[in-house]
Amino acid sequence: MARSTGKVRAARLTDLAALGELSRLAQGEADATRSLGLPVSGPPIGVFSLFRLPLGAFQPHDALYVFERDGHIAGLLRVERDSGRDEWTVVELDAVGGLDAGDVRFRLVQHLLRDGAKRGATRFHVACADADDNVELFMQAGFVRFGDERILFRRPGDMPAPWSDAETRDAGIRPTSPLDAVALSRLYAAVTPQPVQRLECVRIADWERQGRDWRVPRSSLVPILRFADVYTYVLESRGGGRDGTQLDGFLQVGVAKEDQPHYLKVMARPEADVAPFLRFALGVIVERADKSTLGREGVIAPVRTYESPLDRRLEDGGFEDIATVTLLMKETLVRVAEPRLVPAGVR
């Protein structure tokens, strides 16, 4: 790997034109130019999506870092910050062309980790294809590989009709509410392996967040797809379980208003019949999507490998496997085996 000459710094408004061109090149149609190897790229970089009004009380939604060399932008790294959980997610990492592109990307990641730790970030997330040394780059920077996620896609075409209120009620499907937080936490614990639960550290309070702020359960595509509308539903268990609140499934639907696929994330118990739940989800998209674009956009659904047989139920519903991505994470906190008093520090 060639050693690059240059420096990493925070992006400035005057970098916008160069950033837009670099992002466009890295997210072209050729697979080799996708910086992280994800099958869906984000919307083009624009001044309104990346830079907010310079008010001291507000932080920009995204943080950008660039690699500058000889007055030119040779690389960029963009992260989405979840202020509620102090988690940062890498959504773009570009360095197009040149023999030292790998070193440029590594230096951007190292700068991100240093700057994020100073700003109180507790976890860094990234999802990438296991190609072009993506996984090796992040593991060299201290990230831990904890799972894989299959990306399934349903091509535009015939979609189920929206359900009536009576059909929805009879199937035990209803919109979520903050009161479902405990039941959703139990559902997540029932379908997620213990090691992944410890790494993701999803709290009951995270399940209370609604709408666009909902970031659980995590997937590789949530930070990249910028939804106009997000809808969430639960599938109630027949009989309600021991305490009457048990849930068999959770559904998150993102209806895209841009030139991107609609989004579907399902979490369900292995023994639950989710086929009606999936048909309901597709009906929600038909009902909520812009009718002029419904026939052009497909539906994309991420499924983690340990969530089987959910992937087979999606394939039965017309979805096909288009990619597999690797999930990695780095923690800045130190885990302890036993609680104890430690010296306090000031950030």
PLM regions and their residue ranges:
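A conserved beta-turn-beta hairpin within the catalytic core of GNAT-like acetyltransferases
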Residues: 81-91, 255-265, 323
